[in-house]
Amino acid sequence: MHVIVATDGSKQSLDAAKRLKSFADPSKITAISVVAVIRPLAAVAFADDLSGGQKTPADRDTSGFRAAAESAMATIAKEFDGWGPKVHQRLRSGSPANEIIKTARQLDAGLVVVAAGGRGISETVLMGSTAQRVQHYAPCPVLVVRPKPRKKKS
């Protein structure tokens, strides 16, 4: 089975990859494709929660988006080092939900893993909208990993 693990560069997407590892049998997975999607003419930069690097003005252009996406994919791919299945990194451009779904179809994926509530223009209004669209239209089962509950202030 080919598994797609989508990342938007958020810590939630890393948590989703770790969740897959926590229950899946690596001998049943033939390959993992880590997919990042950059949006053309994006108003919001690709998340960079995983690299820990400092942002510079140059990082805000499209090459910065690409570098952040590649860094996020590398971080997720590293999570699967030595686990078993071969890992591929696939950078796409377009609508995140559409590109994730298209990749799942092209690769005949058996599972798509996405985080709910990653990054977006408004995290409160669009919380999980990519995950919802992927869940609704993907050609295979979808594992949606919700963020850890926030601690309530006393």
What do these predicted regions represent?
Residues A77-V112, R150-S154:
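Structural beta-alpha unit
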Residues S33-V35, H88-R92, L143:
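General small-molecule cofactor/ligand-binding pocket signal
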Residues Q54-S71:
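A short acidic, glycine-rich active-site loop
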Residues M1-K55:
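Small/aliphatic-rich secondary-structure junction motif
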Residues L111-Y137, K151-S154:
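Glycine-rich, Arg-bearing micro-motifs that act as flexible, cationic patches
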Residues S22, R105-Q106, H136:
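Solvent-exposed polar/charged
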Residues A36, A115-G117, R146-P147:
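Short secondary-structure boundary segments
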Residues A16, V44-A47, I101-K102, T124-L126, ...:
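Short, well-ordered secondary-structure micro-motifs
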